[in-house]
């Protein structure tokens, strides 16, 4: 596709964790790329630096807010595709995006803020269950309104989970002992953030992903917790002491711990105890798999990912 034929993409939540990767990939792929930002974001030193980077890619900044219907509608009328990457506190506010898309009438595809695990297959405990339920509610609303969509299921963000194996306070993989959630046997899936962005932007104009759930399941990256630890042990030539956190232990911490830890552990319970990331088949016609659709994309394997930490 030449640039003039590529869809115009609006990213809402573009300065967030996964949003910034999508903005960069969209712009560098030749899509006219727009980012909705609050004017107050410019006053944040870290975010303003990121916004300068966006400008260097040729991104158009549109000032507005997900809670301001007028600014939302104005932004949406300028594009073909809307991608939302808003965080959990704003999942419910995506109703405003749905209403604006409905009113504008010009959107060819909406990608709501998914970018995690398939909430239609997950069996999460609180506080993750409420977050997943909000995503489910948004899905059903999109479908009921007849808005063209793609749901992006990328599973674990590799850069978020693999460097610390779920221990949020660590910056590098362990070299002495490791805590493993559950028995470590259920398979999970890990995808590098840059690859998530590449597959997502590939999908926006692809008729094969229209009204479908796009699952990212790179074959080399479907690994159990035990397999990830073994791979790391091979890299460093050392056997780690393994502490297995039982389901009972996890449930106890989820009850008593601080909220960010509770949410993270509840998601870990869903993935590593229930196996919700990979315990189901991608079912056509509603489900499609990214590495099968885009075999030319060279994804980063978990094995390659760990090389930089050795």
From Swiss-Prot:
It is found in: Cytoplasm. GO terms for molecular function: NADPH binding; oxidoreductase activity. Coiled coil: none annotated. Its EC number is 1.3.1.-. Induction: Stimulated by jasmonic acid (MeJa). Induced by wounding. It comes from the Eukaryota. The active site is at residue 135. Disruption phenotype: Reduces capacity to produce anabasine and nicotine associated with barely detectable levels of pyridine alkaloids in leaf tissues. NADP(+) binds at residues 13-19, 38, 47, 139. It is an enzyme of class 1 (oxidoreductase). GO terms for biological process: alkaloid biosynthetic process; nicotine biosynthetic process; response to jasmonic acid; response to wounding. CDD domains: PCBER_SDR_a. Its main location: cytoplasm. SUPFAM superfamilies: NAD(P)-binding Rossmann-fold domains. Pathway: Alkaloid biosynthesis; nicotine biosynthesis. NADPH-binding protein. Involved in the biosynthesis of pyridine alkaloid natural products, leading mainly to the production of anabasine, anatabine, nicotine and nornicotine, effective deterrents against herbivores with antiparasitic and pesticide properties (neurotoxins); nornicotine serves as the precursor in the synthesis of the carcinogen compound N'-nitrosonornicotine (NNN). Reductase involved in a late step of tobacco alkaloid biosynthesis. Triggers either the formation of a nicotinic acid-derived precursor or the final condensation reaction of tobacco alkaloids. This is Isoflavone reductase homolog A622. The lineage of its organism: Eukaryota, Viridiplantae, Streptophyta, Embryophyta, Tracheophyta. The gene is A622.
